[in-house]
Amino acid sequence: MRYAIVIEKSDGNFSAYVPDLPGCVATGKTRDQVARNMHAAIELHVRGLAEDNLPIPKGHASAEYIAVVA
C-alpha cells in the first residue's frame, strides 16, 4: 500500500501526518528523519488496525502544488 504524507516545517523540527490514516503522525529534526519516522509510524499504525480487526484504509489522498501570483 502507498500513502501520501504531509510534511510541515516548524521551529526546529519537522512534523508529518497521513491524511488517509487519522492519528498517524511523526516528527523529526530533518526532513529525511521525519520521512523515515513516518514510514515506521505507518507500519505500526496499519499493524495495530489489523491486530484489532479494524479496516485498513486505502490510500486515496494526493497532493498538487498550485502557483499563484502574490
Language-model segment annotations:
Residues 1-3, 36-70:
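Short, charged, surface-exposed hinge/linker loops at domain edges
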Residues 7-21:
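Short aromatic-glycine-(Arg/Gly/Cys) micro-motifs in beta-strand/loop hairpins
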Residues 20-23, 58:
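Hydrophobic residues in alpha-helical membrane-spanning segments
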Residues 22-32:
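A short, exposed loop/beta-hairpin motif centered on an aromatic-Gly-Thr core
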